[in-house]
Amino acid sequence: MSGSGASGNKFRMSLALPVGAVMNCADNSGARNLYVLAVKGTGARLNRLPAAAAGDMVMATVKKGKPELRKKVMPAIVIRQSKPWRRRDGVYLYFEDNAGVIVNPKGEMKGSAITGPVAKECADLWPRIASNSGVVV
């Protein structure tokens, strides 16, 4: 069981990707971008769109990419967000794009490599993503 699924707690972050957002796909699975359909594990408030931050699992579809990946709902994890968020040490951090990777429901990646940096909040929470990432910021 070790190494699969989310491990530990995640601090509150600025929510960057509401339902309907499109983000880049940063793995080598063959998908180019991901369309957010739902956010896993969020509470609800009347008339508020669920939104995700780095480290959150979302349900997404592929809008551009390999035909065998398109038109299916699959879980993905957000690894970068362009909206600034505050870390506990007072540093504000943001990336130049929104990006995610396709995973299975247990959190294991479909691809085998991640392009670009990964947020530390995401790498701490998802061990399989941390092991496949090049740079953790």
Curated annotation (Swiss-Prot):
Entry-linked SMART domains:
Ribosomal_L14
Concerning InterPro entries, the annotation shows: Ribosomal_uL14 (IPR000218), Ribosomal_uL14_CS (IPR019972), Ribosomal_uL14_sf (IPR036853)
What keywords would UniProt list here? Cytoplasm, Ribonucleoprotein, Ribosomal protein
Q: Name one GO cellular component term.
A: hyphal cell wall
A single Gene Ontology MF term assigned here is:
structural constituent of ribosome
Give the record's GO biological process terms.
translation
User: Which family is annotated?
Assistant: Belongs to the universal ribosomal protein uL14 family.
Indicate the quaternary assembly: Component of the large ribosomal subunit. Mature ribosomes consist of a small (40S) and a large (60S) subunit. The 40S subunit contains about 32 different proteins and 1 molecule of RNA (18S). The 60S subunit contains 45 different proteins and 3 molecules of RNA (25S, 5.8S and 5S).
Full protein name: Large ribosomal subunit protein uL14
Native species: Candida albicans (strain SC5314 / ATCC MYA-2876)
